[in-house]
Curated annotation (Swiss-Prot):
The gene is TXNDC17. The modification N-acetylalanine is found at residue 2. One of its GO terms (biological process) is tumor necrosis factor-mediated signaling pathway. The lineage of its organism: Eukaryota, Metazoa, Chordata, Craniata, Vertebrata. Interacts with TRXR1 and DYNLL1/DNCL1. Keywords: Acetylation, Cytoplasm, Disulfide bond, Redox-active center. Disulfide bonds join 43-46. Residues 41-123 form the Thioredoxin domain. This is Thioredoxin domain-containing protein 17. It comes from Pongo abelii. GO terms for molecular function: peroxidase activity; protein-disulfide reductase [NAD(P)H] activity. It is found in: Cytoplasm.
Amino acid sequence: MARYEEVSVSGFEEFHRAVEQHNGKTIFAYFTGSKDAGGKSWCPDCVQAEPVVREGLKHISEGCVFIYCQVGEKPYWKDPNNDFRKNLKVTAVPTLIKYGTPQKLVESECLQANLVEMLFSED
């Protein structure tokens, strides 16, 4: 059995539903540019950060939930009124957060294995 549960979602509504379904659990969320049919994100920083974040998951506490959230295509993401920007204050991708706390890593911070590991391992 996995130490943690991973949920993959696309868009704000699916993210919101996933959070509601896992209410009461420690939730980490990784926001990334959406991928095309070939599995490639429009966000080059997200492509670089994903293996670092995946490696960091080895340090996540048992029973936590990891939500992998594709934020949409670039034009939607760049809209200052999109729900991620307005409701979650996620202003850049990639972003890794501990949901419900001020703890987050943004852009190049997601490339630093020590920071990713620290975020996942803090209680």
